[in-house]
Amino acid sequence: MKAKTLKKDKVNIITLGCSKNLVDSEVLSGQLAANEIDVVHENSKLDHNIVVVNTCGFIDKAKEESINTILDQIELKRRGKLDKVYVTGCLSERYRGDLEAEMPEVDAWFGTLELPLILKQFEADYKAELLGERMLSTPKHYAYLKISEGCNRTCSFCAIPLMRGKHISRSIEDLVKEAEALVQKGVKEIMLIAQELTYYGLDIYKERALPKLLDALADVKGLEWIRLHYAYPSKFPLEILEVMQRRDNICKYLDMPLQHASSSMLKAMRRNITREEMSELIHEIRSRVPGICLRTTLIAGFPGETEKDVEELKEFLQEHRFDRVGIFSYSHEENTSAYDLEDNVPAEVKSARAQEIMEVQQEISYEKNQEKVGQIFKVLIDKKEAGRYLGRTEFDSVEVDNEVVIHSKKKLAIGEFVQVKITKAYDYDLEGEVVG
């Protein structure tokens, strides 16, 4: 049954999972608002009557969170607090048939590419001319820019292609228009995201076009920081580094998930790269862009992982001293090629290995942060909390990296850039004072 778009209707969008999901929710919000439907994000006031849950289905913990959130909304509906509950996103795409049977209280389920169908529930029209128009749920000074959808890689552990489909690039023209629209809204920093950045353009331009896209975005007036997330290491286009070095508003920052460093694990994961090749690439990146911040993500407990593999990974971290590291325990996902392997590393061992690896990185992070004491950095003010300002350098992305705690006698504006001298350093944070 369709939701009646009466004046009293107010839609709350709850977003779970990654920044790519967040962009999808912002696009949906923009379309609803353009159809004169009242919409909010993560509304805790319970003054809405319709909910759209945008789910994540990436790993077990994410699936659990998504299911619990849906159940919470169903309970609110049962108590008469909500009229409608709709579910979209990766969990819905992947398990819709099962979930429909288990949760009949949900009014409708949608996949990841069914925005027009969601809008039909509100008797709203999909407005193609609004491509790129979004209702931002982030602070107005930064936003994510999703440059493509889906992924053509075949990593053995990853279920994302099952939920998001094959790689589809957006055109450079459309992305530049969206970036310009974001800057008009007050955005100063854009984080480029995709399942895999470096594949960008191969489908529509028959070449790896990320360097051309970066050059075009760097020309957008008023865009002060452009940040790159999720670059695949195999066949990495080195031309990206030339653009990064040449253009001042492209952050000297690269998020490159490596997943492991043991060659046997990399082969089992189908990463199409060896430890030696990764080492060569890291040296090349750092030689071409001195001072670059390298972030990576790792997996602990992949099937067949031995203590020797873990030691190799720790040695790799100590050798290459990444600036930022995140780690996940392996999740055994059905319909992936790794699902045919025995999930033979116990959960407690996965957790212990992840902790062990992060302890190595924690020491590296502390040492690298200590080196920053006394230096002056350009810092973007993100928020004010407990009487202190919190910001980031160009070497830190939102939520996952260092924060700079800023002491200032004068009032600072959220979204303002200031020069900060670092006075103290901790494992994952810095302190400093405004200078100049």
Where are these regions (language model features)?
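Conserved glycine-rich "GG(E/T)P / GGGxP" loop and the immediately following alpha-helix
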Residues: G57-A62, V187-K212, A216, V220, ...
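Radical SAM/AdoMet-radical enzyme domain recognition
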Residues: Q184, P211-K212, D219-I226, F236-L298
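Conserved, mostly hydrophobic/aromatic
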Residues: C155, L175, L192, L228, ...
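Short, electropositive alpha-helical surface patch
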Residues: Y205-A218, L238-K252, E305-D323, A347-A352, ...
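Terminal RNA-binding accessory module
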Residues: D340-G436
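Generic beta-strand/beta-sheet core signal
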Residues: I193-Q195, H229-A231, P257-Q259, R295-I299, ...
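Conserved strand-turn element in the central/C-terminal portion of the radical SAM core barrel
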Residues: L16, T154, C158-G165, W225-S234, ...
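Proteins enriched for Cys/Gly/acidic motifs involved in redox and nucleic-acid/cofactor modification
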Residues: M1-Y200, E239, I250, L254, ...
